[in-house]
A protein has these predicted regions:
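Short beta-strand segments at enzyme active-site cores
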Residues: 30-32, 66-71, 123-131, 173-177, ...
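Short, acidic/polar
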Residues: 12-22, 55, 105-117, 214-225, ...
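Active-site-proximal loop/turn and secondary-structure-junction residues that shape catalytic pockets
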Residues: 34-38, 71-75, 130-134, 178-182, ...
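Glycine-rich, proline-tolerant flexible connector loops at the mouths of alpha/beta enzymes
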Residues: 33-60, 75, 130-138
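C-terminal helical cap(s) of enzyme catalytic domains, especially alpha/beta-barrels
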Residues: 299-304
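Active-site acidic/histidine proton-transfer and metal-coordination neighborhood
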Residues: 16-17, 21, 61, 78-204
């Protein structure tokens, strides 16, 4: 549903319209989500370079490039714990709801189509989520059985290695957004995944400092540690203001009431000047992609 202030944003439901808006606001590229056929037909893009050239042409008319493709929702469904199956069903076609085996198969096919599409578009980095087999156990109570974490990452790697291998054959890097709710949610878990995949050369990082603010991780030192793996960058701000009632876990509060919440760039606590300095220092060659989820301002304000 769109209220008055959002209506002008909501009616832009075609790639051409979105491109016009982005160009008018000074953007140079767009990151395309791959789960909405009104914008991008992933099945067609995976099999047809002509279709991909057509999409590039639509945006080129507006003076825009495609920065990357996003496969967050499909990646999430590559690995899902049963505790989340009902909530994650909405990411898949309705005919797959309640059928985890077929849903997972669909997600893997989608990932491979997106890899093919990225190759057709001439784009190396591709955004995704790792999915989560273990995240429900991140707090050690009840105590985790010995070996559970190792087995979990072994299974996660088993699911992703064929996809990573396909990505390698197409010259595509899968950039996992390090994100709460995913098994890859900090540097330690990314390293666990790397080890489980035998340091697969196509396993990379989508760096988003907002998620590190919310879990109180040093987002600047993270760049020092993982500079060689960071191939994508989301510009998203956040703030963390703990109280005597709630902290990192948030107390099940709505976003606007949580101690940790996303904000528009400049309204939060992220030191973007230092981030851009570090990324430049390490010769980061990717795009700075605005991702907006502010709980206070409107989408139109965020786009501007």
């Amino acid at each position: 549903q769109c209220d008055r202030r959002q209506r002008q944003m909501c009616i832009r439901d075609s790639l051409k319209d979105i491109g016009k808006l982005a160009s008018s606001l000074g953007y140079k590229a767009v990151q395309i989500p791959t789960w909405d056929k009104r914008i991008f037909d992933l099945d067609k893009a995976g099999s047809s370079k002509d279709y991909c050239d057509e999409v590039k042409g639509i945006l080129k008319e507006q003076g825009l490039e495609i920065s990357e493709l996003s496969t967050h929702l499909q990646g999430q469904l590559v690995a899902s714990h049963p505790a989340y199956d009902l909530m994650f069903d909405v990411f898949a076609p309705e005919n797959l709801h309640g059928n985890v085996k077929e849903r997972t198969k669909w997600a893997i096919e989608q990932m491979n189509n997106a890899i093919n599409a990225s190759n057709h578009l001439g784009i190396s980095p591709m955004a995704s989520f790792s999915g989560a087999l273990l995240f429900h156990t991140f707090y050690p109570w009840p105590q985790r059985p010995t070996g559970l974490v190792e087995e979990g990452f072994k299974e996660l790697a088993k699911r992703w290695k064929p996809i990573l291998n396909h990505a390698d054959s197409k010259g595509v890097d899968i950039c996992y957004e390090i994100h709460p709710g995913e098994d890859l949610h900090d540097g330690v878990t990314f390293e666990r995944f790397l080890k489980a995949t035998n340091n697969h050369s196509r396993a990379k990082i989508l760096y988003d400092p907002s998620h590190f603010v919310l879990q109180q991780l040093d987002y600047l030192q993270f760049i020092d540690f993982y500079k060689d793996y960071i191939k994508m960058f989301h510009v998203k701000d956040a703030e963390f203001n703990p109280t005597g009632k709630a902290g990192v876990y948030g107390g099940y509060l709505d976003w606007k009431d949580r101690p940790g919440r996303f904000r528009s760039p400049g309204d939060g606590q992220v030191d973007f000047k230092s981030i851009f300095s570090k990324l430049s220092q390490y010769d980061f060659e990717g795009w700075a992609v605005l991702e907006w989820e502010c709980c206070i301002k409107s989408p139109e304000q965020g786009a501007k």
